[in-house]
């Protein structure tokens, strides 16, 4: 959405009294009185972080069986994390704050997540030889993921809370990152993005003084429908976050399209594109 400044000019006659700012005195006709200002979108932005620990695996050709190589991941490794720079008070929709994620392999081919549960997905990434850029095959990457939301509804002490979230359907938050229509686990989000329930609550509590977001809420908030009040209500404050990664003990599976001998370096880059609406 394009951010636009809007000005309004009005021609009028007026009587001036009291202490005011005024132009110089003129003879005859007083001329135009300019009334104007600006309208801007909130300064809230999405912040993103990508993992750096998935690029130093070391294996031998002896581990390849029928052109398949299993690659063990010994420690938790971040894949992608996201959080808002601040909470937003008022209507959420219409502020270019709804992120849709598209992933692609090195050649631009689309990576479509295969969701295996409400907290897990696999992605198939093309692999190439770093030396001559020839394709080597595909790499299956298992990811755990979660998303979280903190919301204060004005005057509502029941549902004002830090909660699990349902999203991911077309046009809604986290499209391409969560299983559409299935609630996610906020605790998995915190594992990967480093936030806490208290921090989530703090972002909205400072926008709604005197009101609080419960951190013991066990339910979920519905962000899977753009007509829902979570998107349209002006009487609330919201803050969202996301996280995904490869859990310790997981296995990446490389399916090679050719035999490999000697030494080579491989790479399976994932290009992340965020589209805001």
From Swiss-Prot:
One Pfam short name: Fimbrial_K88
Annotated family: Belongs to the fimbrial K88 protein family.
This protein's name: F41 fimbrial protein
Keyword Nucleotide-binding set for record: no
InterPro entries, alphabetized: Fimbrial_K88_FaeH
Residues spanning the signal sequence: 1-22
Function: Fimbriae (also called pili), polar filaments radiating from the surface of the bacterium to a length of 0.5-1.5 micrometers and numbering 100-300 per cell, enable bacteria to colonize the epithelium of specific host organs.
Source organism of the structure: Escherichia coli
Subcellular location: Fimbrium
Domain of life: Bacteria
Entry's Gene Ontology BP terms: cell adhesion
Keywords of the record: Fimbrium, Signal
A cellular component term, taken from the record's GO annotations: pilus
